[in-house]
Amino acid sequence: MNYLNENIDSLNKKLQDGEITAEDLAKETVKNIKETDKKINAWITVDEEAKPAENLDFNKNKLAGIPIAIKDNIITNGMKTTAASHILYNYMPVYDATVISKLKKAQATFVGKTNMDEFAMGSSTEHSYYGETHNPWNLDKVPGGSSGGSAAAVASGEVVAALGSDTGGSIRQPAAFNGIFGIKPTYGRVSRWGLIAFGSSLDQIGVMSKRVKDSAEVLNVIAGPDEHDATVSEQEVPDYTSFLGQDVKGLRVAVPKEYMDAVDGEMREVIQKQIDVLKDAGAIINEVSLPHTKYVVPTYYIVASSEASSNLQRYDGIRYGYRAKDTKNLLDVYVKSRSEGFGDEVKRRIMLGSFALSAGAYDEFFKKAAQVRTLICRDFEKIFEENDVIVGPTTTEPAFGIGEEISDPIKMYNNDLLTISANLAGIPAASVPAGLVDGMPAGLQIMAKRFDEGNVFKVADFIERNNKFYEKTPTGMED
């Protein structure tokens, strides 16, 4: 079964009516993945024996029997988890991430693990030990990253929803590139227990789907407290679907000058059109400034790389993962295992982070980056004193060609310009399809104050109802 024209509600109805069984749905999903993925490469692991939970309750659990894709940096008991790295090529977890446990309780079906940039470090899903993923809209283009596999799996109709992780835009940028919806919740809204760490003060698990409501349904399940994660919030989780179907009259919408100045031509026209739709519906549009936007890329890459260099120290070739052969002593095991096990981009960021944390550079780099991060947070706090949401482009350009930017790390890093501020500030942010630019999807980014995912869903759903982008079929999937 291909899900290009399906959603969680439609599948739930078919399951309730007996039009299809959960067992057949799992089998058909795997069959479709094996056919479709020959040209997409969205998956690292596909469970060909995928089975639904027992005693399914389709009335109580909207996700019962629904196949969900899982990014391969989220721990799954008994299913290989590699983070798209050679160093974890044979890692078989013995426990589930909290989000997986919650989805199991909701009786969702797991069909496999999706491709990604190694350890979530990248913006194109080209930095994977298992090969690059292709964009379903144009197979010669990247799907974005690092959650490019999850995005491509949804956009190509292999699944209706997928989990991703977002450290600097890794859900929102691929969502924009693939013409789907993707949301990064507030830092602490969803447990990170069982998420392979990249930047621990930035990482957040989120959801990707073709329809806004599908992400709301999944976030309803995975959000909330967790005894295993000290950073997760105890705040009550609202029913995110209750924010759908509302109008935006009177909603105060901020549009950052710096974000609009970062785009031009057709991209600017597409984004402005969606802003005008909100204005015509009665939203109050306010031009604002995020003055520290010019510092977000260096700030982010210092903070994220520093945290990564610390988190990745655990991969030493001793406890688990790849161990180099023909080593002479313990130090040789460490050096060779890490040199051979990590890819170039991961090693680049480890070196950058190790330097920023070194005694001679700490005050000059990491400490200053932390201070600028505080200023960035204050910029957002000031705007949210008089505005409900912030909107603007998700990316500065549509998807670029495979191989075009992989040899230019600085150009690749600058792709994150418009998304990383939300991670530095810890606020919820999403990307919803806005239209096409040069035949490729472009996304409208929506941000709100901490724990106000409701307004993000409200605006995204309004945009979706207006432009009905979900009715479009990716051109790379047309026969």
Curated annotation (Swiss-Prot):
InterPro entries: Amidase, Amidase_CS, Amidase_dom, AS_sf, GatA. Allows the formation of correctly charged Gln-tRNA(Gln) through the transamidation of misacylated Glu-tRNA(Gln) in organisms which lack glutaminyl-tRNA synthetase. The reaction takes place in the presence of glutamine and ATP through an activated gamma-phospho-Glu-tRNA(Gln). Keywords: ATP-binding, Ligase, Nucleotide-binding, Protein biosynthesis. GO terms for cellular component: glutamyl-tRNA(Gln) amidotransferase complex. This is Glutamyl-tRNA(Gln) amidotransferase subunit A. It holds the Pfam family Amidase. Heterotrimer of A, B and C subunits. PANTHER family: GLUTAMYL-TRNA(GLN) AMIDOTRANSFERASE SUBUNIT A (PTHR11895:SF151), TRANSAMIDASE (PTHR11895). The active site is at K71 (charge relay system), S146 (charge relay system), S170 (acyl-ester intermediate). Belongs to the amidase family. GatA subfamily. It catalyses: L-glutamyl-tRNA(Gln) + L-glutamine + ATP + H2O = L-glutaminyl-tRNA(Gln) + L-glutamate + ADP + phosphate + H(+). It comes from the Bacteria. Its EC number is 6.3.5.7. PROSITE patterns: AMIDASES.
